[in-house]
Each structure stands twice: as structure tokens, then as C-alpha cells.
Amino acid sequence: MGARKKEQAAVGRVGGEYRASRNGSSSRVRLEENRTSEDQAILERRAELLSKSGINSEYLSAASLLSKEPALEVGGECGAAFLPDDCQLDAFRTVAFIEKGNKCFASKGRYAEYFNNPAISLIRSEDGVVEGIQTVENVLYCKQALVVAAGAWTGSLMQSLSIKPDAVPCVPVKPRKGHLLVLENFNRIHLNHGLMEVGYLGHKAAKSPSDVDDDLLSISMTATMDMVGNLVLGSSRQFVGFNREVDESIIRCILDRAGEFFPAIRALSRNINQIRIGHRPYMPDGKPVIAPVPGLPKVLLAAGHEGSGLCMALGTAEMVGDMILNNPGKVNRTPFLMQGRFV
């Protein structure tokens, strides 16, 4: 998600430092909380499935949950799925770390950055094979492949790059706007783990914008402490195109929802230090596209990861690299192909 300049400036100060926390006193393991018997059944089943898959997971009773997170208001039917091996990434530091690694290849002619230089069209050979891309200022040739990984803009970019838009397969990735609230140096509560309500999982898989009102809003509680002690609250999801305006009513909804879980937040003023706005690349079936583009030799897509792009970035890059080099895949690629998924 995008951030205000104050947060962006912090990236420069940390340079390429990468941080992920887990376990011990600074752990940010995940708790998925339920408040109804229906949610309890969902999380108990989820914890069981994760355990069977080899992921450390257990279901916590209300008493066990309260012992781990005293700041929570825990009712009789409350409980949580506890994932003690989960990690929390600092998005800004992680991106800076990856970027620093990429720049090491610049001196070898294997990496370059082009900002404010939009792509205009694909460059094709006489037999239709894509050979490169034309930007406003440059012609960039590709030897083995061209990978389009433009997040929520991927679908519209693919259409704009083709001389005959109807010849390009439709990529139904949609922007799904979200707000995150950052409360700097917030000391009224202390969190020992990253927290989310079980409804967050359902909201993430909400219906396509073609099936619902464009401005349908879903709010589910998420709460984490970042590396410098700020409380980060979320989260909202809505289909409103690429609108980037801060919506004060959504801020109120996020705070009100968080207040249902944390009494200390209920009396909080609306003066939030930072508000992050961004667009998740939503796919109707909940899976990203990581695949060659039918009818466009040498072109691959990597898009539609919704809110999991950062966590899945390195795995996606490995999959794409294996496709380009014709290496055997380490995972089943079929669910991520384009064929048969979109009408």
C-alpha cells in the first residue's frame, strides 16, 4: 500500500536492512480470533487442516487467548487459531532489501530502473513473437521473455499494449481499495502477536465487483505492532476503481471495529498519525495469474496476488524463472494458468 511522505522517508534511513520477526518476546505470530460458535467451528477446522499440512497450528480457548493477549476483550465464545511460526514482514524495509539486491546486478548490465516512462506498445517480429516493449522514451528488447507484473493495473496495461486489444486475453484483475491506520508510539495497549478476526478470511474472498455494488465496503479487524512500536490497524476492502482519496467514514468504521476487540481504543480520537491507501490486485477466483499469455509468445503474467503479493513475491519470481528457463516446476502450476479460468 502507498504511504504518506513521512513513512516513505523512513525507508531511506533504514537503507537495505531487512527485518522479519518471529517467536520470543518480539514475536509477531498470528492469532485469528473468533467470537461466535460458527466462527469457532471454522477456526478449529482451519487449525486442524494446517496441522495436517505440517504447519504448526492450534486452537486456543478463551482463557488461553486472554493469557496471550491481555489487551483483548474476550467473551465466553471467543477463541483463536494460533500460528506460532508465522512471521511479520516490514513492507518498506523488505522492498528496500529486495531493491538493494536487484541493484547489485546493474553493473553487470542485468538490471535497470525506468520511472515515469510508461510502456506504450509491444514490439513484435514479423511472425508475431514479442521482442520487446516501446516506452515513451526507450525501446527495451527482451531476449527470452517479457514479464508483466503491474499489480491492479495489469489488465488495463495488457489491453493498452496491444495494437488489437481483442487479440489479448482478458485479465480480470480489479483494484480493491484498502485503508490502514498507523498510530505512532501508541502505548495504551500492547500486542504480543499479530491479530485478525476470522471474518478477514471471508472478506478476502468476497464476491467479484460484477456481483455486488461497486462501493460495497467490508471491514474486518486486523492489528499488529510494527518494528518501531506503532500500532497498525485495518482493514477495509472495497471496489471503487483507482480512487485514492482518504474516506473519513471508513476510518471511523475501522476504529469502531477495533474498539469492539480492544476497549482501550474506544475513546481514541480520530486524529490518526498516518493513513495508508492502496489497491490490492483482486482476482475473481482468489488465485493469482502466474503463467505464459496464450497467443503472445515470450510474454508471461504475474499478477492478482491481492494482499499477499509481498509474501509471495520470491516464490512467484522462482516460478516465473523456472518457466522462462524450462525448468521443472517445484509446485503444480495448473491453478495459476490462464486457460479455463476466465470467461
Model-derived features with residue positions:
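Dinucleotide-binding Rossmann-like beta1-alpha1 core, especially the glycine-rich loop
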Residues: 1-68
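Short beta-strand to alpha-helix junction loop
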Residues: 2-5, 34-42, 82-103, 114, ...
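A short, glycine/Asx- and small/polar-enriched loop/turn
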Residues: 38, 71-77, 123-131, 141, ...
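C-terminal lid/capping helical subdomain adjacent to the catalytic/cofactor pocket in oxidative enzymes
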Residues: 59, 64, 126, 286-343
